[in-house]
A protein has these predicted regions:
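Non-heme Fe(II) oxygenase metal-center motifs and adjacent flexible, charged/small-residue loops
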Residues: 1-291
Length: 291
């Protein structure tokens, strides 16, 4: 069956059986879990960022998405590094950044969205590895984009009925590979599982209903070791020698970035150059987190 726009697939049995048996517990123990905030509210899952930190000068990739503050990037932990190598072998290119998320129960979820491609290398794949309880990813085509808003709720309902939905079960030790064409034309998310335990399959109830998701990406935007300078694909300065200061908590620049993220979320197959072409130097949308 074709998944998404035809540039996506799911891979089973990513890790060898012996590694698969211990991967969830090892990850659960070794990852430094943190809370993340968006629009001053806590997102319903725990998170951690890991990536490729340059040995010579400490520079590192940065992946920006709608969160009040960008998470600190940590060195690859042992199990994540091993999984990354397996994933790279399957997709055929390097993966220098990972957003790791812990879904603590069926109630933890992520709203449907398109990944923000400001910092993602053009032509690369987005790779999501699942460990633990099986959850289902929903893919749904975006609403038809028109220059005018629908005339009525009926128009909106008709648009919604024309949208295609796919459901992709993601069992333990599987890897969902998403191409950027699918990301541009479809939204993806994981809805809360509100079913009583008796209605869930053994794979959905495994690992205490917990799931760890590792999303690997190839990132083309970089920060200096102290996060004071930014350059690369998604920044204003494209070359390291021209790196510019990061911007933190500036309302006007933050809103400009939030608006660009919104355009990518809503538009079908959006033009990267139109949305992001001038570049953004915003690192933290807000300068302070809530207490």
């Amino acid at each position: 069956d074709i998944i998404g726009s035809g540039d996506s697939k799911i891979v089973y049995n990513l890790l060898e059986p012996d590694d698969s048996k211990v991967a969830f517990q090892d990850l659960f123990s070794e990852v430094h879990w943190q809370r993340m905030y968006h629009a001053a509210g806590e997102v319903p899952r725990l998170v951690c960022c890991q990536g490729e930190i340059e040995a010579t000068d400490g520079s590192m990739p940065v992946y920006r998405h709608p969160s009040d503050q960008s998470l600190p990037l940590l060195h690859w932990s042992p199990v994540v590094a091993k999984i990354k190598e397996r994933a790279e072998a399957r997709v055929g290119h390097t993966l220098n950044h990972a957003l790791i998320q812990l879904y603590r129960s069926g109630q933890d979820h992520i709203s449907e969205h398109s990944d923000k491609t400001l910092d993602i290398v053009y032509g690369s794949k987005i790779v999501n590895v699942s460990l633990g309880a099986q959850r289902t990813m929903r893919l749904r085509t975006k609403r038809p984009t028109t220059m005018q808003a629908p005339d009525s709720n009926l128009d909106k309902m008709q648009n919604d009925r024309s949208r295609v939905t796919q459901r992709i079960p993601m069992p333990h030790n599987s890897m969902f590979v998403m191409g950027l064409e699918t990301n541009g034309s479809w939204l993806h998310g994981i809805t809360p599982d509100k079913r009583p335990a008796v209605e869930r399959t053994p794979t959905e109830s495994a690992y205490g209903n917990m799931r760890i998701s590792i999303t690997f990406r190839q990132i083309g935007t970089f920060l200096s070791a102290d996060s004071d300078l930014i350059w690369g694909q998604g920044a204003v300065a494209k070359e390291k020698i021209e790196a510019r200061p990061t911007i933190n908590g500036n309302p006007e620049e933050s809103q400009r970035l939030i608006d660009a993220f919104g355009f990518e979320n809503q538009g079908t197959a959006p033009d990267w150059n139109v949305i992001y072409g001038t570049g953004f130097d915003v690192l933290h949308i807000k300068s302070e987190l809530p207490e």
